[in-house]
Amino acid sequence: MNNFLISLALQESSTEVQGGLFDFNATLPLMALQFLALTIILNLIYYKPLGKILDERDEYIANSLTAASAALSKANDLTKRYEQDLAESRKKAQDIIKNAQQDAQNIVSSKIKEAQKDADQLMSNTYDQLNIQKEQALQNLEKQVDILSNQIQIKLLGN
């Protein structure tokens, strides 16, 4: 049996093997042409449209980022402007309130001075009237004293 296996192995090694891994015959150029044709067809049908779509996508993303950046910049500028306007409005409102308080205080002061002046005038008039009434009362009293003294004199002398 060993002899049979050895003879079989010798027959196998003596026969010529065709179609190996690196066989250089007419199929090699045909395979190269098929590979080139497949590459060209795939390039035309698949890779160029895919590349175009990817380029459009990149352009869209770049445009979107640019637009978003511009919108953000504009929003920041508007925010700053509105904050400045708000601060200015608050300052104006505080100035208006301060002026209104000063005006109110001036009005109150003038009203107090006017009331004080009126009160002083009233006091002066009242004092003058009281002095006039006092003088009249004293004159009446003097008249009555004269009348009474005359009556007392008449009664004392006439009796």
Swiss-Prot record:
UniProt keyword annotations, A-Z: ATP synthesis, CF(0), Chloroplast, Hydrogen ion transport, Ion transport, Membrane, Plastid, Thylakoid, Transmembrane, Transmembrane helix, Transport
Subcellular location: Plastid, Chloroplast thylakoid membrane
Record-linked SUPFAM superfamilies: F1F0 ATP synthase subunit B, membrane domain
Gene Ontology cellular component list: chloroplast thylakoid membrane; proton-transporting ATP synthase complex
CDD domains listed in its UniProt record: ATP-synt_Fo_b (cd06503)
Topology term for the membrane: Single-pass membrane protein
Claim: Acyltransferase is one of the keywords in the record: no
UniProt main location, coarse: plastid
Cysteines joined through disulfide linkages: none
MF-aspect GO terms: proton-transporting ATP synthase activity, rotational mechanism; proton-transporting ATPase activity, rotational mechanism
Segments crossing the lipid bilayer: 30-47
Subunit and interaction comment: F-type ATPases have 2 components, F(1) - the catalytic core - and F(0) - the membrane proton channel. F(1) has five subunits: alpha(3), beta(3), gamma(1), delta(1), epsilon(1). F(0) has four main subunits: a(1), b(1), b'(1) and c(10-14). The alpha and beta chains form an alternating ring which encloses part of the gamma chain. F(1) is attached to F(0) by a central stalk formed by the gamma and epsilon chains, while a peripheral stalk is formed by the delta, b and b' chains.
Family that this chain belongs to: Belongs to the ATPase B chain family.
Function recorded in the entry: F(1)F(0) ATP synthase produces ATP from ADP in the presence of a proton or sodium gradient. F-type ATPases consist of two structural domains, F(1) containing the extramembraneous catalytic core and F(0) containing the membrane proton channel, linked together by a central stalk and a peripheral stalk. During catalysis, ATP synthesis in the catalytic domain of F(1) is coupled via a rotary mechanism of the central stalk subunits to proton translocation. Component of the F(0) channel, it forms part of the peripheral stalk, linking F(1) to F(0). The b'-subunit is a diverged and duplicated form of b found in plants and photosynthetic bacteria.
Additional facts recorded: In plastids the F-type ATPase is also known as CF(1)CF(0).
Protein name: ATP synthase subunit b', chloroplastic
Protein's organism: Antithamnion sp. (Red alga)
Source taxonomy: Eukaryota, Rhodophyta, Florideophyceae, Rhodymeniophycidae, Ceramiales
